């Protein structure tokens, strides 16, 4: 009887540990999913920012070209 109780106690202990590890992995997976959404938002904002900077540089370059042309009367 004592051996049976010992075995059941050992099984209960091992089951509790494995359940705890599974819950930790599940929590870690959920956290990784949140980071992915955050990274997507950052990449979209980064792309929009890069496009706006490129458009601003292009507009500034065309304005400067026009001004230099008019100032030097070479248009």
From Swiss-Prot:
Propeptide stretches are: 23-40
Family affiliation: Belongs to the frog skin active peptide (FSAP) family. Brevinin subfamily.
Q: Which Pfam families match?
A: Antimicrobial_2 (PF08023), FSAP_sig_propep (PF03032)
The identity of this protein, by name, is Brevinin-2ISc
Tissues/organs with expression: Expressed by the skin glands.
Q: What does this protein do?
A: Has antimicrobial activity against Gram-negative bacterium E.coli ATCC 8739 (MIC=50 ug) and against Gram positive bacteria S.aureus ATCC 6538 (MIC=25 ug). Has no activity against methicillin-resistant S.aureus ATCC 43300, B.subtilis ATCC 6633 and against fungus C.albicans ATCC 90028.
Q: Write the signal peptide boundaries.
A: 1-22
Q: What is its main location?
A: secreted
Q: Which residues form a coiled coil?
A: none
For this chain, the annotated S-S bridges are: 69-75
Q: Where in the cell is it found?
A: Secreted
Gene Ontology biological process terms in this record: defense response to Gram-negative bacterium; defense response to Gram-positive bacterium
What is the organism of origin for this protein?
Odorrana ishikawae (Ishikawa's frog)
Q: Which domain of life is it from?
A: Eukaryota
Keyword RNA-binding listed: no
Print the keywords alphabetically: Amphibian defense peptide, Antibiotic, Antimicrobial, Cleavage on pair of basic residues, Disulfide bond, Secreted, Signal
């Amino acid at each position: 009887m004592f051996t049976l109780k010992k075995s059941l106690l050992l099984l209960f202990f091992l089951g509790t540990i494995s359940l705890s590890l599974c819950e930790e992995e599940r929590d870690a997976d959920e956290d990784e999913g949140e980071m992915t959404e955050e990274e997507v938002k950052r990449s979209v904002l980064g792309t929009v920012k890069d496009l706006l900077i490129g458009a601003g540089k292009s507009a500034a370059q065309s304005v400067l070209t026009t001004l230099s042309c008019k100032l030097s009367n070479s248009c």
